[in-house]
Structure formats: C-alpha cells, structure tokens
Amino acid sequence: MSNPRVFFDMSLSGTPIGRIEMELFADTTPNTAENFRALCTGEKGMGKLGKPLHFKGSIFHRVIPGFMCQGGDFTAKNGTGGESIYGAKFKDENFIKKHTGAGILSMANSGPNTNGSQFFICTDKTSWLDGKHVVFGQVVKGLDVVKAIEKVGSDSGKTSKVVTITDCGQLS
C-alpha cells in the first residue's frame, strides 16, 4: 500500500495563495497518518466537541519564521483546542522520522502522548523536536506556499494576515 497524499488549498486574508500537497507516512506512523488524512477529508462527521472533524475553514494560528507554521485547531481556532478522530488525545506512535528540514509535517502537542488535531509544518531543520513530536509526513509540492505563509508570521507566532485552509482533501 502506498502512502496517502493529501492537500490544503490556502489563502491569506481571503486571497488564494496556492496548494500544499503532503505525503503521509502511513508506512511508519499509520495511526497518526490516518488521523490527519481523515481530518483532511472530513469523512468522520461531527466530533465529541460538536464541531466537524475537518480542517476545512480552519486557520494556521501560530507562524514563527525560521521555525514552523502551526494549525489544526478547528474547535477554538487559537491553539487551545482541536480533536482527533479517536475522540481523546492519542499516544505518540513513534519517533522514527526526524525533523530534518523544511516541509516536515509533525504533530503539535502539550507533552508526551497528547496528540489531537494540531500539527505543524517545519520551515527549517528543528532537530531539538526529535523524540518529542511525531513526524508523520512531508510536503511534496507547494513548499513555496509554506514559505509565503511563513512571511506573515512573527517571533511571537501572531500572523499579520489570516492564514486559512480554504479546502482540503485526499489526492491518492
């Protein structure tokens, strides 16, 4: 079975800026990859928090240049929420893959075994996160879109424009 590919169509304050295509590492992190894939398609319907389990319409709430772009909080939209397809937080699957450079897709968390729906895309090598955050995919097309998002970030993570996932889904 080949690894699934998913996409985000992105906008900055309502202006479309392009598509990010990502390969999910189902071969090494099947549970984490499946969570992200299903949140891209929205196929699981409503979550326990009463919000659709879907990234569509959610924002990248934290963008730090030279580090990462973080999103996936489709419940509170500020970094305090989110929900996995498994209901609760789920365990760190493994730390086989490393934060080797720009385009790495990894789970955001608040400590060990606290994965939900929040994720980040690295804009540089972030090796200090190895062993703490689960790497489960990589950008295969649209790194220029990630770099455009990075440009509206700040040292505090606050963005100068609203960074929105206007559409998302599975390609293969």
Swiss-Prot record:
Alphabetized InterPro entries for the sequence: Cyclophilin-like_dom_sf, Cyclophilin-type_PPIase, Cyclophilin-type_PPIase_CS, Cyclophilin-type_PPIase_dom
PROSITE patterns: CSA_PPIASE_1 (PS00170), CSA_PPIASE_2 (PS50072)
GO CC annotation terms, alphabetical: apoplast; chloroplast; cytosol; Golgi apparatus; plant-type vacuole; plasma membrane
Domain PPIase cyclophilin-type: 7-170
Disulfide bonds: none
Tissues expressing this chain: Ubiquitous, with higher levels in roots and flowers. Confined to vascular tissues. Also detected in stigmas, base of siliques and anthers.
EC number(s) from the headed UniProt entry: 5.2.1.8
Keyword Isomerase found: yes
Enzyme class: isomerase
Localization of this protein: Cytoplasm
Alphabetical keyword list: Chaperone, Cytoplasm, Isomerase, Rotamase
GO term, biological process aspect, one: protein folding
MF terms (GO), sorted A to Z: peptidyl-prolyl cis-trans isomerase activity
Induction statement: Down-regulated by salt and cytokinin treatment.
Catalytic activity of the protein: [protein]-peptidylproline (omega=180) = [protein]-peptidylproline (omega=0)
Regulation of this protein's activity per its record: Binds cyclosporin A (CsA). CsA mediates some of its effects via an inhibitory action on PPIase.
PANTHER family: PEPTIDYL-PROLYL CIS-TRANS ISOMERASE, PEPTIDYL-PROLYL CIS-TRANS ISOMERASE CYP18-4
Function: PPIases accelerate the folding of proteins. It catalyzes the cis-trans isomerization of proline imidic peptide bonds in oligopeptides.
Family under the similarity heading: Belongs to the cyclophilin-type PPIase family.
Oligomeric and partner information: Interacts with A.tumefaciens VirD2.
Name of the protein in question: Peptidyl-prolyl cis-trans isomerase CYP18-4
Organism name: Arabidopsis thaliana
Gene: CYP18-4
